[in-house]
Amino acid sequence: MKKTIFITGASSGIGKATSLFFVQQGWNVIATMRSPENEKELSGSPDILLLKADVNDTSSVLDAMTTGIARFGQIDVLLNNAGYGQQGIFEAVTLEKIRQQFEVNVFGLMETTRAILPHFRKRKTGTIINITSGAGRVTVPLVSIYAASKFAVEGFSEALSYELESQHIKVKIIEPGYISTPFYDRAKADYAFDPQLEDYSKFQLEMNDLFSSFGAMDTASPQDVAETIFEAATDDTHQLRYVIGPDLLPMINLRNSSSDQDYIDAMRGQFMPEAFGKSMQQKN
């Protein structure tokens, strides 16, 4: 029997690329999104079932899973991909925006995971793949809320992997670096700004200039991520984390090879070189 993957947030970027790649590899795909009626590229294959599901509406997720199982017989892999990135100085991000970030990136992911577990337990097999981010391992300024949500998913996923081992269910974490997708367009559109916080103006300009240069770096593509997701789904190992992106690997390697304080000092020197240099001189 052909295997089946259930994907959230399949309308663009990593979700869409993964849907197309898995079909090319001979899988069935249940591609879910909030507005499937607007999707054209994924609608032509008999092996792709387009369904409406919003991770913040558990009943819609359960309905999509039930419909998908009726169509394809079973679900073998859940890909929790739906999410977005709230950016901006922490003081400028309202509590409403913070809650919404966690509703989508954390609570929606958790409830989607909860929804699939009875099916996986009944079958005594299944793989849950959670898309986190480099920001869940090594974070930077202006993404404190997004990073907090991804750190939460990292901790949840690791702890869950230990729990579900007893049920023969695997948990995998995909950690992309910078990927050029509509994800970043939304992040820019949702950027939290408060003109009254003038004290941060110079810092924000410098950081935005720095982050704008990331697009010119050697980075991974949605296709690269899709291929790594396929590896995680099929490699039959207990590997938990899969890091993607030449921009991210050096930062993770630095964190792993340095003491905690040496790493923090290096990052502070990167983001606030003048102020950090003065503070280090005063210490010495």
Would you name each region that the model predicts?
Residues I89-F90, K97-R99:
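Substrate-binding pocket helix/loop in short-chain dehydrogenase/reductase
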Residues T113, S149:
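Active-site helix of classical SDR
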Residues I169-F214:
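C-terminal beta-strand-loop-alpha-helix "lid" module of Rossmann-like NAD(P)-dependent dehydrogenases
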Residues S11-S12:
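Conserved glycine-rich cofactor-binding loop
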Residues S133:
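Residue(s) in the substrate-gating loop at a strand-loop-helix junction
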Residues A53-D63, L95:
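The beta1-alpha1 cofactor-binding region of Rossmann-like NAD(H)/NADP(H)-dependent oxidoreductases
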Residues T67-N80, Q86:
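A glycine-rich helix->loop->beta "capping" turn
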